Amino acid sequence: MIKVLIVDDEPLARENLRIFLQEQSDIEIVGECSNAVEGIGAVHKLRPDVLFLDIQMPRISGLEMVGMLDPEHRPYIVFLTAFDEYAIKAFEEHAFDYLLKPIDEARLEKTLARLRQERSKQDVSLLPENQQALKFIPCTGHSRIYLLQMKDVAFVSSRMSGVYVTSHEGKEGFTELTLRTLESRTPLLRCHRQYLVNLAHLQEIRLEDNGQAELILRNGLTVPVSRRYLKSLKEAIGL
């Protein structure tokens, strides 16, 4: 079965696509969302094989949403748009395909045929990594999904239970993004095997006798620095 997630702010557009896909014996619609914030959470939770994604949505567009997904768990992306002018941009965002609204069933059939062919070649549907810088980090916590702006991130830590983002206010949220992805797509600096830090919130570095160090942030929280990353940290702040 091919697991499909639909993200579109237009109820009628979602319904029309759902009706057609439900007629396909090898398609399972695992969820529908009306905006990108819900969509990000659904991708993380439901792990769809294919994401049918509207480009024009309020607050966060479909193109912006793709840039917030972890490339290690990104499904095939089929963009939906009423304007052909978005086609080139869609493929720059590693789209598998794009469909113009209103969706033509014959055109959709061709897309599904290509998807089936790709699925027969491999079991895991991962797309190439998009190196566009992240403006937000999608987080979950306190029974909600929210987008934390980069300027508000104090540090990120990796634990046995996952990756956690701590804000400058000291609030913590879980993210599906890996430390490796965050390091490559944000200004956060690696200071430890399990930590990334936002130097904009750095107040003090305390050096220790064993060659390690500890960062004191403006909010009073501390972040460890290992010997391996101490030199690059000093260089980053001009020492």
From Swiss-Prot:
Where on the chain is 4-aspartylphosphate found, per UniProt?
54
The segment(s) forming the HTH LytTR-type domain are 137-239
Gene Ontology terms, MF aspect: DNA binding; phosphorelay response regulator activity
Post-translational modification note: Phosphorylated by BtsS.
Keywords carried by this UniProt record: DNA-binding, Phosphoprotein, Transcription, Transcription regulation, Two-component regulatory system
Q: Where is the Response regulatory domain?
A: 3-116
The entry's function note states: Member of the two-component regulatory system BtsS/BtsR. BtsR regulates expression of btsT by binding to its promoter region.
Q: What is this protein called?
A: Transcriptional regulatory protein BtsR
Q: Which organism is it from?
A: Shigella flexneri
Cite the source lineage.
Answer: Bacteria, Pseudomonadati, Pseudomonadota, Gammaproteobacteria, Enterobacterales
What gene is this protein translated from?
A: btsR
